[in-house]
C-alpha cells in the first residue's frame, strides 16, 4: 500500500463500537503514527445529522478520487486507531479546507 497521509480517504473493515463485528466502510485518515498505526474517523452514508459532531462530505470536497455516494458524513466522534494492514484500499484525498474543519471539530471534542 502506498504511504498514507492526513486527509486520505481509505476503505477498511471498520469495527462496531461494541467490537462485536465489523463493516466495510470508508474512513478519513486524521493522523499517521510511528510504526504502522493510523488514526481514522468513520465516514457514513446513514443519516447522522442529529450527531452534532458530524461533518458533511461530498465529492466536491475531494482533490482526488471520490466516494460511491455523494451524501456522506464524517463522524468526527467515531475515532479508531488501527494498523495500516487493515486498510483495503485508498479511495481519495479531501481538500485542506475540509480537513481543517475536521481538525477544529476534533479540538472542540477534546477540549470539552
Task: Show which residues each predicted segment covers.
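Compact nucleic-acid interaction/catalytic patches
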Residues: 20-23, 29-61
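Short, charged beta-turn/beta-strand-edge "cap" motif at the junction between a beta-strand
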Residues: 15-19
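C-terminal terminal-subdomain/extension
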Residues: 63-112
Amino acid at each position: 500500500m502506498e504511504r498514507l497521509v492526513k486527509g486520505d480517504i481509505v476503505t477498511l473493515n471498520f469495527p462496531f463500537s461494541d467490537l462485536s463485528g465489523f463493516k466495510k466502510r470508508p474512513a478519513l485518515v486524521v493522523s499517521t503514527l510511528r510504526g504502522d498505526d493510523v488514526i481514522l474517523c468513520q465516514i457514513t452514508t446513514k443519516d447522522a445529522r442529529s450527531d452534532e459532531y458530524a461533518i458533511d462530505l461530498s465529492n466536491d470536497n475531494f482533490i482526488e478520487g471520490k466516494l460511491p455516494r455523494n451524501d456522506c458524513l464524517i463522524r468526527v466522534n467515531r475515532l479508531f486507531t488501527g494498523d495500516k494492514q487493515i486498510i483495503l484500499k485508498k479511495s481519495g484525498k479531501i481538500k485542506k479546507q475540509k480537513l481543517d474543519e475536521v481538525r477544529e471539530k476534533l479540538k472542540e471534542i477534546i477540549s470539552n
